[in-house]
Structure formats: structure tokens, C-alpha cells
């Protein structure tokens, strides 16, 4: 751990801890962190294969449906229509998620874009106007388009892997590695991550090569935004999307 001076937040629990899978939690230390401090993080990562996720049940628990398929009032119809176009003819939630993920990864990455104009919906601005953005935009767009398709989804925030230092055998993670991605709920497997941000390494799903590379949906539509400015959807943000 190499924190900034006076830092108390850590990116994972410093002691054994159990967190319900649908809750948001931030763990903090009760003292300052110093150079050389160490802690151990153990994570339970799914070993579900592509085929497992394609064949997963679509019977979602009520507590998941209650929280993670919500669409805000006034959500832009143009974004909802794009979701319908991208998932048309696809039967499984996994393949729908991959179709949306692939479309978003084709949008150029730019972490220095200006803020949306006053009154312009952030997702419409990202998808149809400026057509570039950073991780918060990609993740929010994917999570909301999945919800339009009736698939439980949320955004999550943390850090990318950083840079590996061969001499120390450690990864160096800084504030610049802060990142937002998408998690999709699959019964029996829980929350499974997806990476819609262009420029980030795609997530490898066991076993090896993903056999669902959008053969039926390789042609990506060019949607036409709805007439006029849609009512504002939530501004892209980090943290699990409630």
C-alpha cells in the first residue's frame, strides 16, 4: 500500500469481512496508512463459462428485480430505442449484454470531453452528439440499456490493475487507475462484470475464446435521436447503480 499522505480510505477490507452481494459498502481504516503497509484481499470470482451464462435461468429473485431493472421517469426514448435495436432477435441476457457491450466499445474513449450542454440528457449527449466519452458514460449507458431490456444491471467502481513493477513483483495503482464498469446479474452465478469502455482490455470469459461474437448482430445500427431534448436521465456516476 502506498497511499497519499493522510489517506484513510482503502480499496478493500483490511480485515475479514462479508458483504451482501446487492449492497454498497465502503470500508475505511481506523488509522492512517503508511508506505509499506500491507493487507490481504480474498475475492470470490465466478468461474462461469460463456455457455454457462448463455444457459443461465432468467428467473430473477424479486429483490433483484425490485432494485436493478428500474428506469427513471423521463428516460430518453432514443436511448431505449437503441437498446431495442441492439438486442433485437437475441434470446439470452448474456448475448444481449455482449451486443450492447460491443457497440459501446466502438465509441472512441476521451476523458477530456466537455460537460453536456444545459438541458441536454447526458446519455443522449454521449451516444448521439459527441460520440466519445470516459468510463462513467460507457458504464451508465450499458447498465441503463440492459435495464430497458429487462436485465438486472448496475455500475460498479474501483480501480484498474495499474502498472506491474517487475522488481517488486507488485502492481502500482494510483488515482489515475480509478475505473467504472458494469455488472449483470445471472441467477446461480450472481453479479458478473462486463467491460464496455473502449481502450480497456476486454474481459476473458472461460473457457478461452468467446463463441458469441455477435454473428447475428455484427451490423451496428445508427439510431436517430428522438425529436427535441429528452428529459434528463441520471448523470453518469460511479458506484453501484441503484
Task: Indicate residue ranges for each PLM-predicted region.
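Active-site neighborhood of thiol-dependent amide/isopeptide-bond enzymes
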Residues: 86-180
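Residue-level signal for well-ordered alpha-helical segments
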Residues: 18-22, 60-63, 77, 112, ...
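Juxtamembrane membrane-insertion context
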Residues: 50, 62-63, 69-71, 108-110, ...
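Alpha-helix initiation and N-capping motif
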Residues: 38, 62, 76-80, 94-97, ...
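Soluble periplasmic/extracytoplasmic beta-strand elements of cell-envelope proteins
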Residues: 40-42, 103, 181-183
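A generic structural micro-environment signature
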Residues: 33, 47, 77, 115, ...
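Structured beta-strand-rich cores of soluble
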Residues: 1-89
Amino acid at each position: 500500500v502506498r497511499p497519499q499522505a493522510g489517506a484513510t480510505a482503502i480499496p478493500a477490507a483490511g480485515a475479514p469481512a462479508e458483504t451482501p452481494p446487492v449492497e454498497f459498502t465502503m470500508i475505511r481504516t481506523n488509522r492512517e496508512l503508511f508506505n509499506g503497509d500491507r493487507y490481504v484481499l480474498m475475492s470470490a470470482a465466478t468461474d462461469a463459462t460463456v455457455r454457462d451464462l448463455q444457459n443461465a435461468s432468467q428467473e430473477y429473485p424479486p429483490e433483484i428485480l425490485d432494485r436493478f431493472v428500474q428506469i427513471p421517469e423521463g428516460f430518453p426514448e432514443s436511448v431505449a430505442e437503441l437498446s431495442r435495436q441492439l438486442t433485437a432477435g437475441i434470446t439470452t441476457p448474456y448475448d444481449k449484454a455482449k451486443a450492447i457491450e460491443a457497440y459501446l466499445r466502438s465509441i472512441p474513449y476521451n476523458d477530456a470531453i466537455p460537460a453536456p450542454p444545459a438541458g441536454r440528457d447526458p446519455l443522449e449527449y454521449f451516444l448521439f452528439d459527441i460520440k466519445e466519452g470516459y468510463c462513467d458514460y460507457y458504464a451508465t449507458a450499458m447498465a441503463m440499456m440492459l435495464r430497458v431490456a429487462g436485465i438486472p444491471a448496475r455500475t460498479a467502481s474501483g480501480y484498474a490493475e495499474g502498472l506491474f513493477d517487475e522488481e517488486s513483483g507488485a502492481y502500482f495503482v494510483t488515482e489515475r487507475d480509478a475505473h467504472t464498469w458494469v455488472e449483470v446479474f445471472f441467477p446461480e452465478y450472481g453479479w458478473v462484470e462486463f467491460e464496455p469502455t473502449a481502450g480497456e482490455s476486454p474481459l476473458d470469459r472461460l473457457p478461452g475464446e468467446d463463441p458469441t461474437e455477435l454473428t447475428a448482430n455484427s451490423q451496428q445500427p445508427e439510431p436517430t435521436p428522438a425529436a427535441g431534448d429528452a428529459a434528463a436521465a441520471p448523470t453518469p456516476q460511479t458506484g453501484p447503480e441503484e
